[in-house]
Amino acid sequence: MGDSHEDTSATVPEAVAEEVSLFSTTDIVLFSLIVGVLTYWFIFKKKKEEIPEFSKIQTTAPPVKESSFVEKMKKTGRNIIVFYGSQTGTAEEFANRLSKDAHRYGMRGMSADPEEYDLADLSSLPEIDKSLVVFCMATYGEGDPTDNAQDFYDWLQETDVDLTGVKFAVFGLGNKTYEHFNAMGKYVDQRLEQLGAQRIFELGLGDDDGNLEEDFITWREQFWPAVCEFFGVEATGEESSIRQYELVVHEDMDTAKVYTGEMGRLKSYENQKPPFDAKNPFLAAVTTNRKLNQGTERHLMHLELDISDSKIRYESGDHVAVYPANDSTLVNQIGEILGADLDVIMSLNNLDEESNKKHPFPCPTTYRTALTYYLDITNPPRTNVLYELAQYASEPSEQEHLHKMASSSGEGKELYLSWVVEARRHILAILQDYPSLRPPIDHLCELLPRLQARYYSIASSSKVHPNSVHICAVAVEYEAKSGRVNKGVATSWLRTKEPAGENGRRALVPMFVRKSQFRLPFKPTTPVIMVGPGTGVAPFMGFIQERAWLREQGKEVGETLLYYGCRRSDEDYLYREELARFHKDGALTQLNVAFSREQAHKVYVQHLLKRDKEHLWKLIHEGGAHIYVCGDARNMAKDVQNTFYDIVAEFGPMEHTQAVDYVKKLMTKGRYSLDVWS
């Protein structure tokens, strides 16, 4: 097929010459342009078939690229650059740690966002003596690149640049509960080698379902000796605490120049301008916030955010991201325990004047604002934070304890895992449990990671609700092993967002929409099988609303099946009335609900799938049905997938391995889609 297309394109100039009297110059130009586009498409389609498929997410506005990171490295005397593909900030944090490590080996490193540079410049990297490029690449969702690595991934797919002489290493961040574990890290590692680059250390694969921090430390402690051996250098000293930012206190600053929680542009919340994205969120008013379940054990809620006049567009299956705020009680306690005035206006300025990152968070601001809106104070701190903090513990035993947990020894790793990670000790808890640990608040703010946006599957259809985005969420609250009660940052914050607001003022939520590949079939007549227990029902509320809307427009709509699961019908049956109405009206062909705690034996969604196996097989094999699974990745999604393997094997009929291939092909064709989390 490829050859026939090449032959056709080769004859185009001759054909055009013969017909010149029949076509105008404009016709010829347009015709040639079309043929050129088709030829380009077929060439690159063939290339893309040889590598894993990632779905491209369109960004609203392409960022401005710097001219050359190699020239910048030359100018600033760097020989190591660490690029990061980061969605939640962890890969960026690891990249910063690696670039900071370089000084111990007589080298100079810099971390960089691939979105800010032209990666075609990689071929010029060998011009720098003993140069090395490292990639810390996270995989997002079902095998996708992170938003900031999308352009880099596209370039890797299409380029044929010769990277001979380029030395590289890759550390991937993934989660084994997902189907495509560390797909991005694996692809970057493989593709760089294909292009001629030389791998100087093995690919690292971090697993967030296990202990990502330990995976990184283990890889890192073997990575640097390999770098030393390859380049013939020696470590110049032990790891030491080096401040990256300097504190500047502003005595008489105009408050109009002070950040109060904005993510990007100063005063962007007062003067909102589209397009809205992660760096420019929209302040949406909460119009509805109602509890969905009975009882007091858990709080499941439905929120509606007003996006009128925002020009935000979304489709069923997209995600809404919200920027939460930390609990003011925790913020005040940190201020009290450190004896700090939280309302001091300050800036943390990068000591490296050549760095693109001038501040760790928007500055100037106050400590209160930083701890409330910009810094993560509720997740267990990583080992590098403990190492830096240890110097401020005046009690030797506490300092030793912190140093041990920050070490790479087996005992230290076990201690960190049990005392920090498994006990879910956040920074306030550590300060409370170590009475002599009293770091300067500015250094603490430098060390803490950024507070990240939280993503939720949109629970509405824009066809029905074009001016609002709906969220379905459960308020997270649990008792940690330390005996403390921990609460989820975003869900606890959202829970307080009442439509009336305080003193009659509107409750506002900074938000933006992230496009997804979790999409209804193009043809409304295609049957859909939706599996979503608990809050996994959220995107299906949008799907069902849209299918109902299509029916109202007089369109023929295929079978719409929902497999939903909850504990008890009188406790946590979400959207019970709405689902019953859709079922009664015929928009929902089947409403199948599994109650796990309503009878002696537990019933889950996979049990109902097995019950309906013959009909499901007919819909899949003969009707071309699309399958959608949303919810827990660790257990539910795997159990459901195994159930479909069994159904396919039984009615195929075929061997188990063939059934697995059958389902995997459904995934490749976009007929088996996942929106899962762990």
Curated annotation (Swiss-Prot):
Gene: Por
EC number: 1.6.2.4
Residues annotated for FAD binding in this entry: 424, 454-457, 472-474, 478, 488-491, 677
Family membership noted in the UniProt record: Belongs to the NADPH--cytochrome P450 reductase family. In the N-terminal section; belongs to the flavodoxin family.
Annotated positions binding FMN: 86-91, 138-141, 173-182, 208
Keyword set includes Acetylation: yes
Protein name as it appears in the record: NADPH--cytochrome P450 reductase
Record topology, Cytoplasmic segments: 44-678
Cofactor note: Binds 1 FAD per monomer. Binds 1 FMN per monomer.
Cellular-component GO terms for this entry: endoplasmic reticulum membrane
Enzyme class of the recorded protein, top EC level: oxidoreductase
Membrane topology, record value: Single-pass membrane protein
Domain FAD-binding FR-type: 279-521
GO molecular function: cytochrome-b5 reductase activity, acting on NAD(P)H; electron transfer activity; enzyme binding; flavin adenine dinucleotide binding; FMN binding; hydrolase activity; iron-cytochrome-c reductase activity; NADP binding
Alphabetical list of PROSITE patterns matching this protein: FAD_FR, FLAVODOXIN_LIKE
GO BP annotations, alphabetical order: carnitine metabolic process; cellular response to follicle-stimulating hormone stimulus; cellular response to peptide hormone stimulus; demethylation; electron transport chain; fatty acid oxidation; flavonoid metabolic process; negative regulation of apoptotic process
PANTHER family: NADPH--CYTOCHROME P450 REDUCTASE, NITRIC OXIDE SYNTHASE-RELATED
Localisation: Endoplasmic reticulum membrane
Keywords (A to Z) from UniProt: Acetylation, Endoplasmic reticulum, FAD, Flavoprotein, FMN, Membrane, NADP, Oxidoreductase, Transmembrane, Transmembrane helix
Catalytic activity: 2 oxidized [cytochrome P450] + NADPH = 2 reduced [cytochrome P450] + NADP(+) + H(+)
Cofactor: FAD; FMN
